[in-house]
């Protein structure tokens, strides 16, 4: 039993993508010289650029969570909060701060709910770092520390890195998915976006020589 527990579980065979193959220029845009957001360790990166204040992102989130749960181990999902300025800025800082302080998983959906459903977090006028810190304090962190971390050098670095990736990927709206830094998905809706991403992931997998026995 111990030996079985220590042996790596066999990787699930990737599910063949559904629907028609995507068309370059219509379903996705090739990013010239595109690179993943961060080192992938040989995995296929899927970056979702989103904003907490974006209603479409709030609606997309449950679909993304379900989609993520079905991805095989060779897919690396990365969420990036877009620092587009205005009310995007404080909530992007909050995202990267929550990530840094280890409370992102338990707060991610809660922030969407607080902005779009409960209206307990403001959009206009802009929330202060202290207001945002007070919100996150309900999830087990020190609110004052959270607020000060939002303005820290480390978070500035994350904001800058995200901005650079978003700019070089040509992303100007949310939610947007970028596959392996090479393809910006331009689907006509949420399900269409995920379908296109599935095809592009399969394409990248095949290009890496990771095609399955079934030829997918």
Model-derived regions: residue spans:
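Structural alpha/beta surface segment adjacent to cysteine/selenocysteine redox centers
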Residues: 48, 58-130, 167, 203, ...
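C-terminal cap of thioredoxin/glutaredoxin-like
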Residues: 1, 137-216
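A structural motif
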Residues: 101-107, 135-142
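Short N-terminal micro-motifs specific to bacterial/archaeal maturation
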Residues: 37-40, 85, 123, 137, ...
């Amino acid at each position: 039993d111990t030996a079985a527990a220590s042996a790596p579980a066999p990787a699930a065979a990737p599910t063949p993508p559904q629907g028609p193959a995507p068309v370059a220029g219509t379903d996705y845009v090739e990013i010239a010289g595109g690179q993943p957001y961060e080192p992938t360790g040989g995995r296929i990166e899927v970056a979702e650029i989103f904003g907490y204040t974006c209603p479409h992102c709030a609606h997309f989130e449950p679909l993304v969570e379900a989609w993520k749960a079905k991805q095989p181990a060779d897919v690396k999902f990365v969420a990036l909060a877009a620092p587009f300025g205005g009310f995007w800025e404080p909530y992007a800082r909050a995202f990267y701060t929550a990530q840094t302080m280890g409370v992102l998983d338990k707060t991610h959906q809660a922030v969407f709910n607080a902005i779009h459903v409960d209206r307990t977090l403001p959009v206009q006028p802009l929330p202060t770092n202290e207001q945002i810190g007070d919100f996150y304090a309900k999830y087990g962190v020190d609110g004052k520390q959270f607020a000060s971390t939002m303005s820290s050098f480390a978070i500035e670095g994350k904001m800058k890195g995200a901005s650079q990736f978003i700019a070089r990927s040509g992303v100007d709206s949310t939610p947007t998915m970028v596959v392996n830094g090479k393809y910006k998905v331009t689907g006509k809706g949420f399900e269409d976006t995920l379908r296109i991403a599935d095809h592009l992931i399969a394409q990248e997998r095949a290009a890496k020589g990771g095609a399955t026995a079934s030829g997918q």
